């Protein structure tokens, strides 16, 4: 891995079957997101949907207990694009969120390059940063849950970034901004073990660790009309929904 201004996604090689499930049409206003929308990605998707005249894949949703709403589990930008284009319905697959075959993990950002500018920008936002005394003490999820992020570096560097969801959002925005400015290469890991191994082998320079949210936490965030930063949740379903190409005419 080398170069600046790039984004690399690292996921373990797994075989997940594609399954056809006939989508149902759900009112766009009955859906609650749990992650922020990325404006550039939303714009691109709106253009794609408008030009193709279809929504290629259904979004994944689950009923929210106690209210007449659904949580967007996967497909935030498809939902937002359909809504922005003025359509009233969106094709969806309803799942049992608490089924043990539906897994919830998080993404772990990492950088290849210098961290100095990033730390400066975080401090400018008034976010408290402390050096860790020993990184082994902060690697467990119960310890990670006390901070927005714990950053560990290849030379046994360790920084604790205090805060929670709001601070994670600020740090994530700074990570993306400096990446776009060519300050470093940004890598997102789907598995902590692989990220730690790459750090040990010198393939990345700094790794950002955090506690994965629980399913109940995700639902509560949505119910409070709050959202996590992009690439906070990583949902793993027992299947990949097949392309169904729902025509836009059906969504009016």
From Swiss-Prot:
Required cofactor names: Mg(2+)
Which SMART domains does this chain map to? ParB
Induction of synthesis: Constitutively expressed.
Q: Which Gene3D superfamilies match?
A: Conserved hypothetical protein from pyrococcus furiosus pfu- 392566-001, domain 2, Conserved hypothetical protein from pyrococcus furiosus pfu- 392566-001, ParB domain
Task: Quote the InterPro entries the UniProt record gives.
Answer: Chromosome_partition/occlusion (IPR050336), ParB/Sulfiredoxin_dom (IPR003115), ParB/Sulfiredoxin_sf (IPR036086), SerK/SbnI_C (IPR023098), SerK_C (IPR040867)
Pfam families in the record: ParBc, SerK_C
Give the binding site residues for O-phospho-L-serine: 73, 75-77, 107, 231, 233, 235
Q: Could you tell me the superkingdom of the organism this chain comes from?
A: Archaea
What is the pH-activity profile?
Answer: Activity levels steadily increase with increases in pH from 6.5 to 11.0.
Q: Which residues form the active site?
A: 35
Question: How is its cofactor bound, per UniProt?
Answer: Maximum activity is observed with Mg(2+), and activity is also detected in the presence of Ca(2+), Zn(2+) or Fe(2+).
This enzyme catalyses: L-serine + ATP = O-phospho-L-serine + ADP + H(+)
- Give EC number(s), comma-separated: 2.7.1.225
Q: Which residues bind Mg(2+)?
A: 74
Q: Which UniProt keywords apply?
A: ATP-binding, Kinase, Magnesium, Metal-binding, Nucleotide-binding, Transferase
The role this protein plays is: Free serine kinase that uses ATP to phosphorylate L-serine to yield O-phospho-L-serine and ADP. Can use ATP, UTP, CTP, GTP and the inorganic polyphosphates triphosphate and tetraphosphate as phosphate donors, with a preference for nucleoside 5'-triphosphates, but cannot use ADP. The catalytic efficiency is highest for ATP. Is specific for L-serine and cannot phosphorylate structurally similar compounds such as D-serine, L-threonine, L-homoserine, hydroxypyruvate, 3-hydroxypropionate and DL-glycerate. Likely contributes to serine metabolism, including cysteine biosynthesis.
Q: Which family does it belong to?
A: Belongs to the SerK family.
Name this polypeptide is given: ATP-dependent L-serine kinase
Q: Which organism is it from?
A: Staphylothermus marinus (strain ATCC 43588 / DSM 3639 / JCM 9404 / F1)
């Amino acid at each position: 891995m080398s170069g600046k201004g790039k984004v690399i996604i690292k996921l373990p090689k797994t075989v997940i079957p594609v399954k056809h499930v006939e989508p149902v049409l759900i009112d766009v206003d009955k859906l609650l997101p749990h992650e922020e929308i990325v404006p550039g990605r939303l714009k691109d998707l709106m253009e794609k949907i408008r030009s193709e005249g279809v929504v290629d894949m259904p979004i994944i949703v689950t009923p929210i207990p106690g209210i007449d709403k659904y949580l967007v589990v996967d497909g935030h930008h498809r939902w937002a694009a359909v809504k922005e284009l003025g359509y009233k319905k969106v094709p969806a697959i309803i799942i049992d969120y608490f089924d043990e075959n539906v897994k919830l993990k998080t993404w772990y950002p990492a950088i290849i390059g210098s961290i100095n500018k990033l730390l400066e920008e975080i401090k400018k936002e008034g976010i408290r940063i402390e050096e860790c005394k020993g990184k082994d003490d902060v690697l467990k999820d119960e310890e990670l849950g006390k901070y927005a992020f714990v950053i560990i570096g290849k030379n046994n560097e360790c920084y604790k970034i205090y805060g929670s969801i709001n601070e994670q959002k600020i740090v994530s925005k700074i990570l993306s901004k400096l990446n776009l400015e060519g300050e470093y290469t940004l890598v997102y890991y789907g598995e902590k073990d692989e990220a730690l191994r790459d750090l040990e082998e010198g393939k990345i320079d700094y790794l950002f660790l955090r506690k994965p949210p629980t399913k109940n936490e995700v639902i509560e965030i949505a119910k409070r009309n709050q959202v996590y930063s992009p690439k906070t949740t990583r949902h793993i379903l027992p299947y990949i929904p097949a392309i169904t190409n729902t025509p836009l005419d059906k969504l009016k």
